[in-house]
Each structure stands twice: as structure tokens, then as C-alpha cells.
A protein has these predicted regions:
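The −1 position to Zn-ligating cysteines in a subset of zinc-ribbon hairpins
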Residues: 176, 180
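Flexible, acidic/Gly-rich N-terminal and inter-domain linker regions that tether
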Residues: 2-164
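Conserved Radical SAM active-site core
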Residues: 129, 137-172, 182-224
Length: 224
């Protein structure tokens, strides 16, 4: 269970004692308690109570879905250059629409002052809310790159059911997700269409799609 603390009382991270790696394990893993950053550092959540924050329904309702909502959350913590950069990406380059839960937003620049530079440099922000300047449009794509980079659609044995390995299948039961990662490997199906990507659509009713999955699995007992 995570702990939460006001930002002014959050202790400085302590480095674990240096441990001698054991045989076969060349890395040292630092262990420290998980402390949830103070969400009230965001102007838009300044008055959000702990009870609200820890409520799953509140988290779902308050997901950031567009630039206007992001402005409300961030306030004046970042400047206009960031929003212009994000808008340019959304209009021409983005493969996923924006959907970021508050808890995920709260992992961005967790314990340092929030500035435009810090927000741009944050690795989780880069993954969840990419901006145009993040992308190397001057570099060509790999010649074998495609929208469905894992070729899962090519291997559908029923709508939404990929059978690539002898004993395993991948069932895509929904075309939505609790959050949309900016560089999702299943962006060809998941989420809303964007100016850059006209997404595939599941056409069968869910009950018919699931029945087709079950029928296939019954006919292939080698799938575990």
C-alpha cells in the first residue's frame, strides 16, 4: 500500500548501502519505501483530499484527456512553449489520443521543482504525453516499420485473437485502455483515431467476438 505525505515533509532519498553483487547478479538494486508524491503541488489538484485521491472513481473521472484539461492541472507551472509543442504533436504526429490518470500524472517530476525544462526532461512525461520536439522527424523510419509493429492483426485467427506461439494466444477484448501511452505498440487498434492514424475498428459485438475466441480455443487444446 502506498503512503502519501505533504510535499514539504517528504524526506530526501537515502541511498542504500553498497552491496557486493552475488554470483550471477551484476546489478545493485536500491530498495526504498514507495512514497506517493504530493499531488497538491499541481494547481488543479491543490484542494483534492486524500479520500478523493485514493478513490478509483475519482481517478477515472479526472483523467487528463486534452490540452485544456492539462492546462487546468498544471496551471502556470509550465510555459506556453510546452503547450504549443504539444498542440503541434497532437495535430500532426500523435498516434494516440491523450488519456492520463491523475496517479500517472503525479509520477512526473515527483520530488523536484516543476518547471518547463523539468517537465520536458521527465521520462514518464515523454512516454505518456509526447510533444513534437521529442520526435526525430529528420530520421527515416525502419524500412520494415509498420503501424502494427508486432503484426498481430496479420495473425488474427478470429477478430481480436492472435495466435503466434504454439501454446499462447493474445486476446484483445477491448479497444480501450485505462491510460493511453504515447508510444503504444498496439496503437493501430487501441484508442481513438488521430490526425496521423485512422485506427482499426472491432466490428463484431463483444458477445460474438468472445464466442469466436472460445470456439477457436476449444478446437486448439494445445493452447494453455
Amino acid at each position: 500500500m502506498t503512503q502519501t505525505q505533504p510535499v514539504e515533509t517528504i524526506p530526501q532519498p537515502r541511498h542504500a548501502p553498497v552491496a557486493v553483487p552475488t554470483a550471477g547478479q551484476p546489478y545493485e538494486y536500491r530498495r526504498r519505501p514507495l512514497v506517493e508524491p504530493d499531488w497538491t503541488r499541481f494547481p488543479g489538484w491543490r484542494h483534492v483530499t486524500r479520500e478523493q485521491w485514493e478513490n478509483a472513481q475519482w481517478q477515472r473521472v479526472n483523467c487528463v484527456k486534452n490540452i485544456k484539461q492539462l492546462r487546468t492541472v498544471l496551471g502556470d507551472l509550465v510555459d506556453e512553449t510546452f503547450y504549443a509543442d504539444l498542440e503541434a504533436d497532437q495535430k500532426a504526429l500523435a498516434t494516440m489520443s491523450m488519456l492520463v490518470p491523475p496517479q500517472m500524472m503525479n509520477t512526473m517530476v515527483p520530488f523536484a521543482p516543476m518547471t518547463t525544462e523539468a517537465f520536458l526532461a521527465d521520462p514518464i512525461r515523454r512516454y505518456m504525453i509526447p510533444v513534437a520536439s521529442d520526435r526525430r522527424t529528420d530520421w527515416p523510419s525502419h524500412p520494415y516499420a509498420s503501424r502494427d509493429s508486432l503484426h498481430e492483426h496479420d495473425m488474427w485467427v478470429a477478430e481480436g485473437l492472435t495466435h503466434r506461439y504454439p501454446t499462447k494466444v493474445l486476446a484483445e477484448l477491448l479497444s480501450t485502455c485505462p491510460q493511453y501511452c504515447g508510444h503504444c505498440t498496439r496503437m493501430d487498434l487501441v484508442g481513438n483515431s488521430t490526425p496521423a492514424v485512422d485506427k482499426l475498428k472491432l466490428t463484431l459485438k463483444p458477445v460474438d467476438r468472445y464466442d469466436a475466441h472460445i470456439t477457436y480455443l476449444k478446437a486448439h487444446p494445445g493452447v494453455r
